[in-house]
């Protein structure tokens, strides 16, 4: 079966077929050629397929989750977020608490794990999770 790509614009309209059959563009509807018959044009119309694309999703919600979703918008259902002190690096960036936790040592908050529990869902990954006090 030959694949074809057709352009419908002001006359003449061209149809490009796959290289296996005919690599040259052929007239789909000829403007000044009276030798082609209506049967040939109808056959070409019936064998060619057109595809249309339809947008099914749009980026209306900047947080990335549905507005009525149970999934936590802060952690996106993971239950943990990047550590706010080390920015996900696992080590202290500066000295903390009068030098008790030195820069370059394991992070004092996440202890080198690079992630901490989400504060919005308490690590559950969904709104109304474990020990949550948020009610609507």
Swiss-Prot record:
Q: What GO cellular component entries does it have? A: chloroplast; chloroplast stroma; cytosol; protein folding chaperone complex
Cited function: Chloroplast chaperone required for RuBisCo biogenesis and translational regulation of the RuBisCo large subunit (RbcL). Stabilizes an end-state assembly intermediate of eight RbcL subunits until the small subunits (RBCSs) become available to produce a complete stable RuBisCo complex containing eight small and eight large subunits.
Q: Name the Pfam families on file.
A: BSD2_CRD
Q: Which InterPro entries match?
A: HSP_DnaJ_Cys-rich_dom_sf (IPR036410)
Q: Where is the transit peptide?
A: 1-56
- For the ligand (Zn(2+) 2), the binding residues are 83, 86, 107, 110
Q: Which residues form a coiled coil?
A: none
Q: What is this protein called?
A: Protein BUNDLE SHEATH DEFECTIVE 2, chloroplastic
Residues the entry annotates as binding Zn(2+) 3: 78, 80, 115
Q: Which family does it belong to?
A: Belongs to the BSD2 chaperone family.
* Self-association and partners: Interacts with the RuBisCo large subunit (RbcL) assembled as an intermediate complex made of eight RbcL and eight BSD2 subunits.
CR-type zinc finger positions in the chain? 62-133
Q: Which gene encodes it?
A: BSD2
């Amino acid at each position: 079966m030959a694949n074809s790509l057709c352009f419908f614009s002001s006359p003449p309209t061209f149809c490009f077929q796959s290289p296996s059959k005919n690599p040259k563009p052929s007239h789909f509807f000829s403007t000044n050629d009276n030798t082609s018959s209506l049967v040939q044009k109808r056959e070409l119309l019936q064998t060619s397929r057109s595809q249309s694309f339809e947008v099914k999703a749009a980026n209306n919600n900047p947080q990335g989750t549905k507005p009525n979703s149970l999934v936590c918008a802060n952690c996106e259902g993971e239950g943990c977020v990047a550590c706010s002190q080390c920015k996900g690096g696992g080590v202290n960036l500066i000295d903390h608490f009068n030098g008790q936790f030195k820069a370059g040592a394991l992070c004092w908050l996440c202890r080198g794990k690079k992630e901490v529990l989400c504060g919005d869902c308490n690590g559950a990954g969904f709104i109304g999770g474990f020990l949550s006090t948020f009610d609507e």
